Curated annotation (Swiss-Prot):
Its main location: cytoplasm. Keywords: ATP-binding, Cytoplasm, Ligase, Nucleotide-binding, Purine biosynthesis. This is Phosphoribosylformylglycinamidine cyclo-ligase. InterPro entries: PurM-like_C_dom, PurM-like_C_sf, PurM-like_N, PurM-like_N_sf, PurM_cligase. It catalyses: 2-formamido-N(1)-(5-O-phospho-beta-D-ribosyl)acetamidine + ATP = 5-amino-1-(5-phospho-beta-D-ribosyl)imidazole + ADP + phosphate + H(+). It comes from Bacillus pumilus (strain SAFR-032).
Length: 346
């Protein structure tokens, strides 16, 4: 042990203890293709063990943003890792790829082995939900950059798809229909606005329970991001999906056009799905316009599929059989951007 380093704020022994605690969680994410063990300089994966003829790797990286601030305030760290995984694997999924492996980066103000284990448990939970192996990562103790209670987490996902099965959105045409999959809540974006509206302006207490919720506000806000990989991949592999969008920062307005060919837009049937109460709660407390809400939040739809009309009924039925709540929320039309029909946004 380096006493000088410890006195400078870096506890090597605590770091070793954290790694030891991680191992059982990492172990349960192993899958076909994983090589080596935790602790090597690099994670290894053998693609030849998988039945892909012309594999294309698809990668994604992301973080959790200021949702972390709520985890600090609630001293609740066991689900924030799920968010880190979800933000990455849902992006990879949007290209039709099966997530293979994941790496995490955790920067902490102070190495607390119990807290780090709790965070990594969440990462492993997310990896299990998505079929990803947690093959490595980095935990950096950074005194002076973060307070002892603070940390940041980011992730990196790699997936694979057959070259001729990549979902690019290029085959989407006017008349394609949009299936929206329900979100679990706010997911992992818009939290700077959430904190300003609910905590700074309204002065609400994260530990209190407010109507219409049945648990403390902080727990409601920390509900982890839903991972859509397994049910959606079944539809992708069946050839029934022509485009996908992960509804994250920028909401419907920014994310739906990302899957569309040039010259096409979408019309969303406002009111065609139930909006979770957390969004109306935020809108009311902040006196926010509906346009603002749709420009920031997922509004209850976390992932969108573009399908042909002939496939609509089968895809919705099969998604619901797999436990998803799926809704016909709109259609592709000529033009640009996102328009709303079926109900006012005011």
């Amino acid at each position: 042990m380096s006493e000088a380093y410890k006195n400078a704020g870096v506890d090597i022994e605590a770091g070793y203890e954290a790694v030891k605690r991680m191992k059982t969680h990492v172990e349960r994410t192993k899958r076909a293709g994983v090589m080596g063990a935790l602790g090597g300089f690099g994670g290894m994966f053998d693609l030849s063990e998988l039945p892909y003829k012309k594999p294309v790797l698809v990668s994604g990286t992301d973080g959790v943003g200021t949702k972390l601030k709520l985890a600090f305030l609630m001293d609740k760290h066991d689900t924030i890792g799920v968010d880190a995984v979800a933000m990455c694997v849902n992006d990879v999924l949007a290209q039709g790829a099966e997530p293979l492996f994941f790496l995490d980066y955790l920067a902490v103000g102070k190495a607390d082995p119990v807290k780090i284990e709790s965070i990594v448990k969440g990462v492993a939970d997310g990896c299990e939900q998505s079929g990803s192996a947690l093959v490595g990562g980095e935990t950096a103790e950074m005194p002076g950059l973060y307070t002892e209670e603070e940390y940041d987490i980011a992730g990196f996902s790699v997936g694979v798809v057959e070259k001729d099965e990549i979902v690019t959105g290029n085959s989407i045409k006017e008349g394609h229909l949009l299936i929206g999959l329900s979100s679990s809540g706010i997911h992992s974006n818009g939290y700077s606005l959430v904190r300003k509206v609910l905590l700074e302006d309204a002065g609400l207490d994260l530990h209190q329970t407010y109507e219409p919720f049945k648990r403390p506000l902080g727990e409601e806000l920390l509900e982890p991001t839903k991972i859509y990989v397994k049910p959606v991949l079944k539809q992708v592999k069946a050839g029934k999906v022509d485009g996908m969008a992960h509804v994250t920062g920028g909401g419907f307005i920014e994310n739906l056009p990302r899957m569309l060919p040039e010259g096409l837009g979408v019309e969303i049937d406002n009111g065609s799905w139930p909006v979770p109460p957390i969004f109306s709660f935020i809108q009311e407390k902040g006196q926010l316009k509906a346009e603002e809400m749709f420009n920031v939040f997922n509004m209850g739809i976390g992932f969108v599929l573009a399908v042909k009309e002939d496939d609509l009924v089968d895809v919705i039925r099969e998604l619901e059989q797999d436990g998803e709540k799926a809704f016909l929320i709109g259609r592709v039309q000529k033009g640009e951007g996102v328009t709303f029909g079926g109900g006012s946004l005011s």
